[in-house]
Amino acid sequence: MKRYVVGISGASGVILAVKLIKELVNAKHQVEVIISPSGRKTLYYELGCQSFDALFSEENLEYIHTHSIQAIESSLASGSCPVEATIIIPCSMTTVAAISIGLADNLLRRVADVALKERRPLILVPRETPLHTIHLENLLKLSKSGATIFPPMPMWYFKPQSVEDLENALVGKILAYLNIPSDLTKQWSNPE
């Protein structure tokens, strides 16, 4: 069993995090979850959910550990804590900006900082449009520092029939990037 950190910041698209966590759990991985206060508000607004745990079965919760964003004393804040990858999904531009300047003032930002300094996979799924120059410069800076910028772009070539198809394709692509098998992962094949 491998350990993954999933951070949820205050950007729209929290369903992507929920789907990713479910897929990681289905693959029997341990998932450490950190949710920002704005992320909790978005969770309620977009999914109508008061409690993060209510989104998962009792069996799934055995693999999920939720951490307070203020728990800077968490083992996750140390480079000695083994983590396969950190994924911040969705990732607000506030979080992008903070990470890009090394501001590690809460557990979510510290875990991202640790991923960069330890040269571990850090995947950021920024949810903002349009992007202005400062957004782009911050994302470029993070990319140059080793982060993978994974914007939630629709994959029209799979001919999605619903928004859920688009969500699943993105989550499947993240899982494929992490080399985690999933039924959500699709591979392009030329229809000719």
Swiss-Prot record:
Chain residues that bind dimethylallyl phosphate: 157, 173
Pfam families per the UniProt record, alphabetical: Flavoprotein
Keywords: Flavoprotein, FMN, Prenyltransferase, Transferase
Enzyme Commission code: 2.5.1.129
Residues binding FMN: 10-12, 36, 92-95, 127
SUPFAM superfamilies referenced in this protein's UniProt entry, alphabetically: Homo-oligomeric flavin-containing Cys decarboxylases, HFCD (SSF52507)
Chemical reaction(s) catalysed: dimethylallyl phosphate + FMNH2 = prenylated FMNH2 + phosphate
Recorded superkingdom: Bacteria
GO molecular-function term, one example from the UniProt record: flavin prenyltransferase activity
Group of enzyme by EC: transferase
NCBIfam families from the UniProt entry: PRK06029.1 (NF004685), ubiX_pad (TIGR00421)
Role: Flavin prenyltransferase that catalyzes the synthesis of the prenylated FMN cofactor (prenyl-FMN) for 4-hydroxy-3-polyprenylbenzoic acid decarboxylase UbiD. The prenyltransferase is metal-independent and links a dimethylallyl moiety from dimethylallyl monophosphate (DMAP) to the flavin N5 and C6 atoms of FMN.
Cited HAMAP family: ubiX_pad
Family affiliation: Belongs to the UbiX/PAD1 family.
The name this protein goes by in its record: Flavin prenyltransferase UbiX
Taxonomic source organism: Chlamydia pneumoniae (Chlamydophila pneumoniae)
Native organism taxonomy: Bacteria, Pseudomonadati, Chlamydiota, Chlamydiia, Chlamydiales
Gene behind this protein: ubiX
